[in-house]
Amino acid sequence: MERGINTKCLHLEEEEGCCNNYGSISFPIYQTATYEHPAVGQSTGFDYSRLQNPTREHLEKIVATLENGIDALAFSTGMAAITLVMELFKPGDHLIIDADLYGGSIRLFDNVSSKNGIHFSRIDCWKENVESYVNENTKAIYIETPTNPMMNVTDIAALAEITKRHNLLLIVDNTFLSPYFQNPLELGADIVVHSGTKFLGGHNDTLAGFLVTNRADISEKLRFLIKTTGSGLAPFDSWLILRGIKTLGIRMEQAQKNAFKIAEWLKTKSAVTRVIYPGLPDHPGYEIMKKQARGFGSMLTFQLESKEFALSVLEKVRMIKFAESLGGVETLITYPTTQTHADVPKKIRERNGITEATLRLSVGIEDAQDLLDEFEKVFAETEEELYGGKKS
């Protein structure tokens, strides 16, 4: 019988049995660099922690199970994972990438991968004729869904039909929804990317990245690359992510409930010109989300009427933290222009809809009313400061 996802977050069925690891309920941290060999040509299965480590291996099995993949690889950061993916390609290869991506991914593609001879077509995969951009050198399509920060939603299954028709890889960054709400491999993706720092870890206390696949040939290539480049996740960080995953479902559900309430509240404010949350029926990707995901997540973006209003909000929040990153238990508000997308050329930012009045919100698990009370206070103070009285 198939176990539920909350159970999968806690228990790895293949390792169940009485008193494994001396009966420890919490999986041990194998804080070691190397391992003793019983004799020449014999091994315990572990030789050197750059190659593999029991704590990291246990985490990888959990993540692979959650994404319904055959293998998962844990990296020191999300960007380390994406960097390694790019090692699958050679000079002259062509990739189609979503126009709206995390700024760090854009920086990698524009300033590192391009210099290594890889060519990119940057398009809106959620609305353009993707197939028309495929050429004889195209090797993969790379997307986020929802995208960061504009929350565009792409039909993964529809895109997978194109990649299968042309023998391309489909690489999907699933960070914003986590495996709790969405499983791209089941929809036809070949590789799933995660910044484990975010929802999987969930506590803003460690960095991690993951690649998950359901193809043995890809797994073999990625395993060789991670062992060769030395970008695997350390034992203690692996344990922190394991601990975070245990409460993934509880956190995702609570944060999503809060996100719905905040999105609805923002829509009532005259100073807010646009609320972008895929859980709202007016979002262009709402129906696709209902089809391919089990939830809408807790990430939202909103546009304010002016840069001055946006900066004032950022300066006045207290319980809500003005900080980069996302997916933790605390609510974080981010200014893409100077933070996550600071290295993205202004022309590209504006083309994607990111302005100096754009704010991104990662909703946490606080009591929703406390979050709303803080926003009410911050908006009122900003309106008093800018307009001399309440506006919305």
In which residue ranges do the predicted regions lie?
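Structural motif
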Residues: 67, 93, 270, 317-318
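PLP-dependent enzyme catalytic core of the Aspartate aminotransferase-like
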Residues: 103, 110, 119-121, 251, ...
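Glycine-rich beta-alpha junction loops
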Residues: 14-16, 31-37, 176, 198, ...
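A common structural junction motif
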Residues: 229-230, 317-327, 378-387
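Conserved PLP-enzyme active-site core in the AAT-like
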Residues: 17-18, 72-271, 276, 287, ...
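Conserved C-terminal alpha-helix-loop-beta "cap" of PLP-dependent enzymes
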Residues: 274-359, 363
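N-terminal "arm"/small-domain region of PLP-dependent enzymes with the aminotransferase-like
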Residues: 1-53, 59-62
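Conserved N-terminal alpha-helix of the aminotransferase class I/II PLP-enzyme fold
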Residues: 34-83, 87-88, 104-111
